[in-house]
Swiss-Prot record:
EC number: 3.1.11.6
Enzyme class: hydrolase
Pfam family, one: Exonuc_VII_L
Protein name: Exodeoxyribonuclease 7 large subunit
Subunit structure: Heterooligomer composed of large and small subunits.
Described purpose of this protein according to its UniProt entry: Bidirectionally degrades single-stranded DNA into large acid-insoluble oligonucleotides, which are then degraded further into small acid-soluble oligonucleotides.
Keyword Cytoplasm carried by entry: yes
Organism of this sequence: Streptococcus thermophilus (strain CNRZ 1066)
Length: 446
């Protein structure tokens, strides 16, 4: 039995062989991605060709660095190591590097990101901002030592010497370049004295220009409050920054020309043209008014000015006559009214009217006294009747007159129908009460 190995022992032995074999420590493979479904961290899938399949794993840290998205059926070249997983006895490939077969990883990443951003609307024309015709200050995000800034300064100074250039020194390639570009775009947007931005660099390989293809740079240009002109690489180079920028310039010189669409000479010519047009307009207005004045001076009004107010004098005379007539008629009416009132006042006998009012007052006073007495007497009679009615309901008075009150359970009885033989009753009399028992009940109407 000692010649037999356990499964665990065999698996450990094979794992040791795999780990120590120099040919398996670094393996270069070409295969097709199969059974792939993207996961949030580590990636698990298969690599296959026409004759075999091997399981593959890319750890999360490595996957972040490969720079492109895996797709089902994609053919890739990978570098990795083979290892055995002891619990299942299976072997797999741990991938350390990967790139698409037949196309560069950066080119694939560029195309994948371009499609994604296009679908999200980053490159739509409706988001493009117009460039201002006149600028006072231009922000430039580029390397301080490159030819880009020199070309921009030279062109702007030639076209419009009064325009200021504000340089944001920026790393434009290598690690950290994309983040620095984003930070400087954000800084520029915080300033109130800038009219637009030029973002760019000179030519280079796709690796050199890659910072301008990073998604964070594209998003920063898209969100810029200031209009952005991109000038990245040579005329044949294209970056995602060119797609998202409001305008793209093939060279730094072209970018400076776009930023100053109207040169100083053009501006001065435009001003002179406007001055001349204004001068000609003033001359035409003066000439028109002079001709109009000459025509008016020959009119009847100016030759016979008294005719200008003849009509008003006639109207004034007419109104004066109407006013005099109205005042005369009004005076006569008021005079007649005053005479009528005087006659009425003269005809009144004041002493007689006072005597009549006194007699009427005395008569009303007597009527009031009589009415008050009658009301009091009537109320007294009604009160006495009500008092007698209340006294008639007093049981003590009823009993005092020789009557008795029969109670059953402390309630007075009014009919024998409420009594049965053998019941106990109470009879209330003037000087006491009796407790009796009913022997016989005979109904008799009174």
């Amino acid at each position: 039995m000692s010649d037999y190995l356990s499964v665990t022992s065999l698996t450990k032995y094979l794992k040791m062989k795999f780990d120590r074999d120099p040919y398996l420590e670094r393996v270069y493979l070409t295969g097709q991605v199969s059974n792939y479904r993207r996961r949030p961290s580590h990636q698990y899938f298969s690599l296959k060709d026409e004759g075999a399949v091997i399981q593959a794993t890319i750890w999360a840290g490595v996957f972040k660095k490969i720079g492109f998205d895996l797709e089902e059926g994609m053919k890739i070249n990978v570098v990795g190591r083979v290892q055995i997983y002891e619990p299942s006895g299976s072997y797999s490939l741990i991938i350390e590097k990967a790139e698409p077969d037949g196309i560069g990883a950066l080119a694939l990443q560029f195309e994948q990101l371009r499609k994604k951003l296009t679908a999200e609307g980053y490159f739509d024309d409706r988001h493009k901002q117009p460039l201002p015709n006149f600028v006072k200050k231009i922000g430039v995000i580029t390397s301080p030592s490159g030819a880009v800034i020199r070309d921009i300064i030279t062109t702007v100074s030639r076209r419009f010497p009064g325009v200021e250039i504000l340089l944001f020194p920026t790393k434009v390639q290598g690690d950290g370049a994309a983040q620095e570009i984003v930070e400087n775009i954000q800084k520029a947007n915080q300033r109130e004295d800038l009219d637009l931005l030029i973002v760019g660099r000179g030519g280079g390989s796709i690796e050199d220009l890659w910072a301008f293809n990073e998604e964070i740079v594209v998003q920063s240009i898209f969100e810029s409050r200031l209009p952005v002109i991109s000038s990245v690489g040579h005329e044949t180079d294209t970056t995602l920054a060119d797609f998202v920028a409001d305008r793209r310039a093939a060279t730094p010189t072209a970018a400076a020309e776009l930023a100053t669409p109207i040169s100083k000479a053009d501006t001065l010519a435009w001003i002179r043209e406007r001055q001349n047009r204004a001068y000609q307009a003033c001359l035409r207005r003066i000439q028109y008014n002079q001709e109009r004045l000459a025509k008016l001076s020959q009119s009847v009004v100016f030759r016979q000015p008294e005719r200008l107010y003849d009509g008003y004098l006639q109207k004034l005379d007419h109104l004066t006559t109407r006013l005099e007539t109205f005042m005369s008629q009004d005076f006569e009416r008021k005079q007649k009214s005053a005479e009528f009132l005087r006659q009425r006042l003269h005809g009144l006998n004041l002493s007689t009217r006072v005597k009549n009012y006194q007699d009427r007052r005395e008569s009303l006073q007597r009527l009031l006294v009589t009415t008050t007495k009658n009301t009091i007497n009537g109320n007294r009679v009604r009160l006495e009747k009500a008092q007698d009615a209340l006294l008639s309901l007093d049981t003590s008075r009823i009993v005092a007159r020789g009557y008795a009150i029969v109670n059953k359970n402390d309630k007075p009885l009014t009919t024998i129908k409420d009594i049965t033989e053998g019941e106990q009753l109470t009879i209330q009399m003037r000087d006491g009460q009796l407790e009796v028992e009913v022997k016989n009940v005979n109904e008799k109407n009174i």
